[in-house]
Amino acid sequence: MAKRDFYEVLGVERGASEAELKKAYRRLAMKHHPDRNPGDKAAEEAFKEANEAYEVLSDPSKRAAYDQYGHAGVDPQMGAGAGGAGYGGANFSDIFGDVFSDFFSGGRGGSRGGAQRGSDLRYTLELDLEEAVRGTTVTIRVPTLVECKTCDGSGAKKGTSPVTCTTCGGIGQVRMQQGFFSVQQTCPRCHGSGKMISDPCGSCHGQGRVEEQKTLSVKVPPGVDTGDRIRLSGEGEAGTQGGPAGDLYVVVNVREHAIFQRDGKHLYCEVPISFADAALGGELEVPTLDGRVKLKIPEGTQTGKQFRLRGKGVAPVRGGAAGDLMCRVVVETPVNLSKRQREMLEEFRGTLQGDTSHSPKASGWFEGVKRFFGDV
């Protein structure tokens, strides 16, 4: 069967650069590697074909011979004289370092056949606004995996010890022959630990770790907000084979407040006032996180008017000046009027008839309406 053109195999032009050749080969090698296509003869042949093409075209002298004589220039069995293209002369280490590093190691992180770091944990901490602003210390209970005290984390029954895995010799990896290449994979017997337990611990069933509710004290600094994380180093799950424990990340969630809304270091609230206070002005008390303060309302205040109380917000957790408290006025319409109150309001309304100087917004609005209908 005639061989395909090597450039065609890799899917590149004849003038392709070294980088383009390498990129094309990596793509094909990942696609057709036997470990990704077990039992697929077509994929195995495509993998071999890509290897052969790259082995020739990545070597400048072999590529020159191939460009001049074709397959005859690199295949001694076809009779030309540029030298053979045996597989043993190719160096694919740079390719494999990029393409198959995770693939060969079974996709597992950490050291082979040794200690493994424990997993990190996440805990959501619910806080009131006052606790978040002032800081607090809370006690939490976290379900986690801790080192088994019965076997000291070895997984073996007390008085015994794990033995070296006879399949991998204790390194946690085995070599598998895949076509022209020797591929390193996680040992299927010990699952990468390098050790075997013939008599497992009865408490942890050979795992070296047991489930436990861990009680921890968490110091919350002043100024934290929803989404902030507090890291407790070493308070995550215990490691295996003597590996270090992971970390615990306490994620803050601040509950909604009945009065205040928070935006960064600033606080916002709505202050309801009577229409009499809005018209005549006055002074009222408003709440802050530090206690009550007096707020002066000027006469003629409208709904939506915002007053700023400087420094009455939140001091940021990372330092800096405290924010402000923004008080937005809402003028309330009176309800459930008495007879006398209704009479007084009727009398008041009568004094406004035909006089728009007391309601500048209404005056402008009605003038706009007249113009609108006049244009229509």
Curated annotation (Swiss-Prot):
Binds 2 Zn(2+) ions per monomer. SUPFAM superfamilies: Chaperone J-domain, DnaJ/Hsp40 cysteine-rich domain, HSP40/DnaJ peptide-binding domain. Keywords: Chaperone, Cytoplasm, DNA replication, Metal-binding, Repeat, Stress response, Zinc, Zinc-finger. Its cofactor is Zn(2+). One of its GO terms (molecular function) is zinc ion binding. Transmembrane segments: none annotated. Pfam families: DnaJ, DnaJ_C, DnaJ_CXXCXGXG. Signal peptide: none annotated. PROSITE patterns: DNAJ_1, DNAJ_2, ZF_CR. A zinc finger (CR-type) spans 135-213. It is found in: Cytoplasm. Gene3D superfamilies: DnaJ domain (1.10.287.110), Heat shock protein DnaJ, cysteine-rich domain (2.10.230.10), Urease metallochaperone UreE, N-terminal domain (2.60.260.20). Disulfide bonds: none annotated. InterPro entries: DnaJ, DnaJ_C, DnaJ_domain, DnaJ_domain_CS, HSP40/DnaJ_pept-bd, HSP_DnaJ_Cys-rich_dom, HSP_DnaJ_Cys-rich_dom_sf, J_dom_sf. CXXCXGXG motif repeats lie at residues 148-155, 165-172, 187-194, 201-208. GO terms for cellular component: cytoplasm. GO terms for biological process: chaperone cofactor-dependent protein refolding; DNA replication; protein refolding; response to heat. Zn(2+) 2 binds at C165, C168, C187, C190. Zn(2+) 1 binds at C148, C151, C201, C204. The keyword Zinc applies. The J domain is necessary and sufficient to stimulate DnaK ATPase activity. Zinc center 1 plays an important role in the autonomous, DnaK-independent chaperone activity of DnaJ. Zinc center 2 is essential for interaction with DnaK and for DnaJ activity. Homodimer. Belongs to the DnaJ family. This is Chaperone protein DnaJ. It comes from Stutzerimonas stutzeri.
